[in-house]
Amino acid sequence: MATTASQIQQLYLVYFGRPADPNGLSFWLSNQSATQETIAKEFAGTPEYKAKIAGKDFAQIVNGFYLSLFNRNAEPAGLNFWVNELNQGKLSTEQVGLIISNAALAQAPTTVDNISVTSKLTAAASFTAEVNKSTAGILAYSGQSGIMRRELPAAGFHHGHHPQRCCHHGFRQ
């Protein structure tokens, strides 16, 4: 079964802390054989992800997943569990991020973690669709030199969103 746009947005949120760029989303949607697991593995090998986790230990990486997904730190028991799994080589960081996000989505829709992730997915889809409306938008948001890397943080955007526009969708910092 092909990976959906929502599943791809989920991976962008987990690994990059931002919505998908239109070209990246289109690329993964056209790759009919790609699963969330294979995309997660690919994302973990990108310069963007490597830069994001550079110099961080497993606890910081796992906590980063919680911050990206839930706007909170990992609870101590959960953090210890994931760090032990990573230290023992049972799981990779890309597997842990995917498992944590999928577990939240598998919870009842009224749980705080599910609401956080689904709200972010809704906002991410809206953001990507808005960017995709113009070539200038696509060029400004895509790639390492894109606007999100330069101007968005300076303008009050965090993780590819603007607090005054998207916080109601769960992108709160």
What does each model-identified segment do?
Residues 1-173:
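Substrate/cofactor-recognition hotspot
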